[in-house]
Amino acid sequence: MADIWTDYGVPGAIIVAQILALMVPILVSVAFLVYAERKVLGLMQLRQGPNMVGPWGILQSFADALKMIGKETIIPAGANRIIFLAAPMLTMMLALAAWAVIPFGEGLVISDINVGILYLLAISSQGVYGIIMAGWASNSKYAFLGGLRSAAQMVSYEVSIGLVIITVLLCVGSLNLSDVVEAQKTVWFAIPLLPMFVIFFISALAETNRAPFDLPEGESELVGGFHTEYSGMAFGLFFLGEYANMILMSAMTSVLFLGGWLPPLDVAPLNWVPGPIWFILKICFCLFLFVWVRATVPRYRYDQLMRLGWKVFLPFSLVWVILTAGVLVTFDWLPK
């Protein structure tokens, strides 16, 4: 860290400030996302949800976090101590690292690299390692089964996500996420690529281990899944990582299909609203869909999950990629 100040001086300080300015709001937004999820679930189930800590219960998540920090991290007998403790840290670190290439507005991105989508795919595919490490190092059959399920599930649906992204790239001609947003000035990709938008969102549910695809932590079958043996802040890091990944996948959905920071129509007064506000509103919409699905759709069986990924999404995505490429070539619509 000292070399940063020596070699780069003020630019080094700016880099650190940018990282903190991104990480702190994400961590705080996780707390409010948990509160919002519990409130929405309460309304859907005809009850109040959190309502005691702070006005309207808005401080409930912070109270839960303080309680969790005070809990002891118990390491099971026979567990691999180093890997057991490294797994939640790896999961949380990867969930935050992926945000480096997400554009919040025009020019508002930490690293505007030309291979931003490849970077996101690479980072998101590493997330399975933290879960496998947790399952194996816990020395528990329930945690191990949860880790195996997660590995199969995430690998299966990353294939579909990759094919969906290829379809978007065919329409854009660039791997830069800012270019993807700029290409949607005329029409959001969610309209012409509606089936791929649906596949991407459902695959995002599976990628983040959210209902109805929360089999790696299926409480009715595996106690708590891969984090059965975790407690205290080690469990808290897994919890933070899961919700940070939810926000990340919502941001990716917004960038790839909902026009990122662009307004629905480029007319007044919609274009008076700053781009980052539109981006945050679209993320909130996607997060509401996450919660809505959790409240209304029952958990899939494992064979149904695999069948959906390999026998439905994979062939359909392949056909749609070929169809999109054919239409672009036939009508000479390939991006220049």
UniProtKB/Swiss-Prot annotation:
Gene (name only): nuoH
One matching Pfam family: NADHdh
Name of the molecule in the record: NADH-quinone oxidoreductase subunit H
Family label: Belongs to the complex I subunit 1 family.
Organism: Rhodospirillum centenum (strain ATCC 51521 / SW)
Enzyme class: translocase
Residue ranges of the TM segments: 14-34, 82-102, 115-135, 161-181, 186-206, 247-267, 273-293, 312-332
InterPro entries per UniProt: NADH_UbQ_OxRdtase_su1/FPO, NADH_UbQ_OxRdtase_su1_CS
MF-aspect GO terms: NADH dehydrogenase activity; oxidoreductase activity, acting on NAD(P)H, quinone or similar compound as acceptor; quinone binding
Record GO cellular component, one term: plasma membrane
Protein's GO biological process: aerobic respiration
Catalytic activity: a quinone + NADH + 5 H(+)(in) = a quinol + NAD(+) + 4 H(+)(out)
